[in-house]
UniProtKB/Swiss-Prot annotation:
Example of a GO MF term: structural constituent of ribosome
Keyword Ribosomal protein tagged: yes
UniProt keyword Disulfide bond, yes or no: no
Paired cysteines (S-S): none
SUPFAM superfamilies associated with the record: L35p-like (SSF143034)
Protein name: Large ribosomal subunit protein bL35
Keywords: Ribonucleoprotein, Ribosomal protein
Length: 65
């Protein structure tokens, strides 16, 4: 059976941790920031973990990462 292909767009956006969780960066941080509060922007800088409902689909996109 041939190797699975990695989805290159997903590989740039997600990475796996040592325990198997998938890390991601938050969206809504590039423009239109004046309407967002300081607290909101500060919390968006922190990384996030992909939800359990999305974990299976994203892990299929990045099988070797």
């Amino acid at each position: 059976m041939p190797k699975m292909k990695t989805h290159r767009g997903a590989a740039k956006r997600f990475s796996k941790t040592g325990t198997g969780k998938i890390k991601m960066a938050h969206a809504f941080t590039s423009h239109i920031l004046t309407s967002k509060t300081r607290k909101n922007k500060r919390n968006l800088r922190k990384g996030g973990i992909v939800a359990a409902s999305d974990h299976k689909n994203i892990s299929c996109l990045i099988p070797y990462k």
